[in-house]
A protein has these predicted regions:
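Short, low-complexity, Pro/Ser/Thr/Gly-rich segments in the mature regions of secreted, periplasmic
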Residues: 83-95
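A sequence-level detector of short linear motifs
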Residues: 19-20, 44
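Primarily extracytoplasmic ectodomains and periplasmic/lumenal surface modules that are beta-strand-rich
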Residues: 29-33
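A short tyrosine-centered beta-strand micro-motif
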Residues: 21-27
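Mid-chain, structured segments of secreted extracytoplasmic proteins
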Residues: 37-82
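Short acidic, Pro/Gly- and aromatic-enriched capping/linker segments at domain boundaries
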Residues: 1-12
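Short beta-strand segments
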Residues: 3, 44, 85-86
């Protein structure tokens, strides 16, 4: 699963600050991990799980939570899929 998303401001993904910009966000269900890419360059990754739902998502969406460090990516919904990806922890970061 993947989607293209534009962050209008800096966002925390796992333990990495991702600068405002347009990125591809992908979810690897086999490894329970999301990856944020700019082109082929990994900007951040984090552990995540797929929470299955009853209804197929009509559109891509992202949700954030506010932390002491700022806005943090919390969950991602991919259009056409039954479920929401919940970010559960930190893994690694790429270069900024």
């Amino acid at each position: 699963m993947r989607q293209i998303n534009t962050f209008n401001e800096d966002v925390l993904v796992g333990n990495t600050i991702v600068k405002a910009g347009t990125y591809t966000i992908s979810f690897d269900a086999d490894n329970n991990k999301i990856t944020v890419l700019r082109g082929r360059r990994v900007m951040a990754s984090a552990r995540a799980t797929l929470e299955m739902g009853d209804v197929r998502a009509r559109r891509d969406s992202v949700a954030f939570v506010m932390t002491d460090l700022g806005k943090k990516l919390d969950r991602i919904t991919f259009a056409g899929h039954f479920g929401t990806v919940i970010i559960t922890g930190d893994t690694s970061s790429g270069g900024q």
